[in-house]
Curated annotation (Swiss-Prot):
Organism: Petunia hybrida
Disulfide bonds: C5-C21, C9-C23, C14-C28
Keywords: Disulfide bond, Knottin, Plant defense, Pyrrolidone carboxylic acid
Superkingdom classification of source: Eukaryota
Keyword 4Fe-4S: no
InterPro entries: Cyclotide, Cyclotide_bracelet_CS, Cyclotide_sf
Gene Ontology BP terms: defense response
Name this protein carries in UniProt: Acyclotide phyb-M
Length: 32
């Protein structure tokens, strides 16, 4: 199950990567 982190990563990396989100198709996604 993937959850949107309400952040995009088109120009900058995901700040939410600190809590486990990753960049997928220009969106920050959290996948368990």
């Amino acid at each position: 199950q993937s959850i949107s982190c309400a952040e995009s990563c088109v120009w900058i990396p995901c700040a939410t990567s600190l809590i486990g989100c990753s960049c997928v198709n220009s969106r920050c996604i959290y996948s368990k």
